[in-house]
Amino acid sequence: MKIGIYGQFYHANAAQYIGQLLELLDQRNIEVLIEEDFLKLIHSNNKIEKDYKHFSAFEELDNSFDLFFCIGGDGTILKSINYIRNLDIPIVGINTGRLGFLATIQKEQIESTLEELLEKKFSLSPRSVLTMQTNPRSYDPVFSHIALNEIAVSRKNTTSMITVDTWLDDQYLTSYWADGLIISTPTGSTGYSLSCGGPVITPDADSLVITPIAPHNLNARPLVIKDHTTIKLKVSGRGKEHLVSMDSRIATLQNDTEIIIKKAPYTINFVELQGDSFLNTLRKKLLWGEDKRN
């Protein structure tokens, strides 16, 4: 068996759990590769002397991996998908952060669930992801990535609104007068889009949602569309530039640049343990439908 491990930060409260995970994997003679920068953090903060194999880019991985552990919060998981892309490696999120909505398990559950994971007693939850291109082409490395949650455009260096002209499959939809616009996947519907009044969409829905950010229009409401729709955006405003984000990655574009957003031709597989489900997570972590009468 072969496992990849990725993390962004090394928190003192997670040290024992990282050590525990590595020890349990070593006891089972499992081949482990750790992302290079995270391995350096482990060596400098933990009394782990073993020199693990490492990786630093998508090109160094392949589909021979059985599992990919992400240690951290939701932000860590969002960044990890760009190491996996179309390799179909199942992701196991180990939450060492706060809410950890996307995580498979909490850090305290490592020992109790590891055998279940290694024996593959789980199902997979495929998640759609987004790609983006620009015209004229931007060579910012941000645009070579994929987004699991959302792609958003927003104003930059101004308190004035921007205007976001929007087309769906080359058919004009409308021009949003707002602070920005979010194009969200079902996975991202519980994130930024939700904060801006968007609906919750189950991960298996073949949909995307377009959610305006603080629109100055009583008729501008979130819109659910088919996920095979090609979305084209063009921003204008008092400033010359605007921001574009792909999950946690941000870049600057000149106004009037065409932004083309599509669903990627592959999905990212999240591990779902027996007894777990999106609806259970929705109730437990976001307190969905919380009512003292229930």
Swiss-Prot record:
Any one GO BP annotation for this protein: NADP biosynthetic process
Chief location: cytoplasm
GO cellular-component term (any): cytoplasm
Active site: 74
A Pfam match: NAD_kinase_C
EC number per UniProt: 2.7.1.23
Highest taxon above the source species: Bacteria
Nucleotide-binding is among the record's keywords: yes
NCBIfam families in alphabetical order: PRK01911.1
Family assignment from sequence similarity: Belongs to the NAD kinase family.
Name assigned to this protein: NAD kinase
